[in-house]
From Swiss-Prot:
Zn(2+) 1 binds at residues 56, 58, 112, 131. Signal peptide: none annotated. Its EC number is 3.1.2.6. This is Hydroxyacylglutathione hydrolase. It comes from Ectopseudomonas mendocina (strain ymp) (Pseudomonas mendocina). One of its GO terms (biological process) is methylglyoxal catabolic process to D-lactate via S-lactoyl-glutathione. One of its GO terms (molecular function) is metal ion binding. Zn(2+) 2 binds at residues 60-61, 131, 169.
Length: 257
């Protein structure tokens, strides 16, 4: 089984480092900065970077790709529908890619960007989802529509509850504060907010999450819940009870929260 660690980058990014201790090969996900990865490789001289996996084209996710490829010769895989530097493998919905001996399924999840993809491995209960699904929240809509993002999140929400969710930003605390504003009487949200507040005070990261936890605490996956619908309508009187409309209202509310 592979080991996964977070390499912090910039203010709140995580570059996920996937490691196979038997082969001493590793892969990274969304290296916006090459420096943390190169530092790790220098400290672990007998390891080889074999793959660089990209979820979308934003610079804080691809900024280190070319330097890493030049230094290591790693294979670069990313969404075919977006401009990804030094890409070797074009990926689209339902494609399969083998990384560190594991065959990942590609899921198209447009919304944050139009070509955004996620990497899913069922047997490992592993989801690498970039900026689509966050712990307690979801990505902003820079390119896609609310309907697209709601559909993408619904697709991720249908994965098994035990699926571990590896997103790429430490936004959990602010997301849960918003979730508490939406559902102030949800005990799961209150408990998670308190727990993550303690973790962050201790300097601990809040990831990975799980699909089960997100279904209980993430308002963007709870658009059919009566309390969430009521909160969305209270915030936007024009909002209907239709789930994608509830999502759109919540996303607009979060953007100014």
């Amino acid at each position: 089984m592979i080991q996964i660690d977070a390499l912090p980058a910039f203010n709140d990014n995580y570059i996920w480092l996937l490691q196979d201790p038997i082969s001493r090969r590793c892969a990274v996900v969304d290296p916006g900065d090459a420096a943390p990865v190169l530092a790790w490789l220098e400290a672990h001289g007998d390891w080889t970077l074999s793959d660089i996996l990209i979820t979308h084209h934003h610079f804080d996710h691809v900024g280190g790709v070319e330097q890493l490829k030049k230094a290591t010769g790693a294979r670069v895989a990313g969404p075919a529908a977006e401009k990804i530097p030094a890409r070797d493998v074009d990926l689209g919905d339902n494609d399969l890619i083998e990384v560190l001996g594991l065959r990942f399924q590609i899921m198209a999840v447009p919304g944050h960007t139009l070509g955004h993809i996620a990497y899913y491995h069922a047997e490992q209960n592993l989801l690498l989802c970039g900026d689509t699904l966050f712990a307690g929240g979801c990505g902003r809509l820079f390119e896609g529509t609310p309907q697209q993002m709601h559909q993408s999140l619904s697709r991720l929400a249908a994965l098994p509850g035990a699926t571990r969710v590896y997103c790429t930003h430490e936004y959990t605390l602010s997301n849960l504060r918003f979730a508490h504003a939406v559902e102030p009487h949800n005990p799961d949200v209150s408990a998670r907010l308190a727990e993550v507040s303690r973790w962050r005070d201790e300097g601990r990261i809040s990831l990975p999450s799980s699909i089960e936890l997100e279904l209980a605490t993430n308002p963007f996956l709870r658009t059919g819940e009566p309390g969430v619908i009521k909160a969305a309508k209270r915030n936007d009187e024009r909002s209907s009870s239709e789930p994608s409309a509830v999502f759109a209202s919540l996303r607009a509310w979060k953007d100014r929260f």
